[in-house]
Structure formats: C-alpha cells, structure tokens
Amino acid sequence: MNFWTSKSNNGRCGKKIFPQFLSLDIPHLSIYSLQIEENSIFGKTGVKPCDSDLEADMFEYITKTLEAAGYIHYEISSFCKPGHYSKHNLAYWQDKDFYGFGCGASGRINGIRYDNTTSLKEYCSNGPCPVYIDETLAERGMDAIMMALRTKFGLNIREWNLKYQSDFKEQYAQVLDKYREYFLF
C-alpha cells in the first residue's frame, strides 16, 4: 500500500487515511513506495512523486504506528501481527525453494530458479513456459545474502558457509572491515 505518492499532499493524506487501515485489523501488511513511471497514467497526468525526505518521514510514521499497534516489522517492507508472517515471502528471504504462478512470476525448485514469461498474450496462449536461470553457486550465495539482510533475522553465516562452500568472513573481508562498526557479529 502507498499513502504518500503525491508531492502535493505532503503526507497529510497518508496520516489521515492510515489509522482507518489499522481499524480493519489486517494481519499482514507490506508497505512500498509507489514508483511513478513517466509513461504510466500517473506520469502522464502530472502526478509527481514525493521527495525522499517526505518518503522517509512517512515510512517512519507508518513503522512507528504499526509497531505501537502490535505489528512486528520483520522485513524492510513487511509487518505482521504475531503468528502471521508471510510463509511464501519467508521462503525466499530465508533461501528456501518457492513457487511462482502466473505471468511474470519467478520461483525456485530444488535450488533452480525460473521465470515465467512477462507477456500476458504468450502466457495465455502457451501456459507456463518457465525459463530456467543458470546461476553460479557464487551468484546464488550473493542472492541469499541480499535476501537475508532484508529481514530482522539476518544471515546465519555458518549455514551460508556450508551451503555455498565458501568462508563468508574471508570472502567479504574487505566489505566487513569497511563497515565493521555497523555489523553485529
């Protein structure tokens, strides 16, 4: 959901509408910033995105409001009531297999990624025709890192080392040294 797409409303609309969503007692919410593309209906009608400061302020407002209402902020964009984590999303954030159904969907079975066509016409004519992605072990390992760092759970380095046949601390020593003050080991 997005409450602060327009530069002109200065976040007022979001702060007015958001409490109404809380009254619905929805068990899981994902909050994303709407990207306004030039050729979209929004772009063509002159809707301007808000600036990054307002976007950050609104995200902070939403985060604090949801946490005060008992939601768990477990991934960059995801919040849930206790016991209502998204099982599908957790699968890819925790480096597990997952299924993707429909036009443009991606999935991973037995460690092999696939993408369905993004062409609705092709998908409707031919059904799912997954294109399998040939990833190296190093590419899969990097993807696992990036996904894990999106969550409050982080990355289990021992498990990563075993699965990707590498030494995380050795492989990323320069990066870790550069940002050591921000990491918890």
Tell me the role of every PLM-derived stretch:
Residues 1-166:
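C-terminal scaffold of the Radical SAM
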Residues 165-180:
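Short amphipathic alpha-helical interaction segments
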Residues 75, 180-185:
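A short, conserved structural fragment
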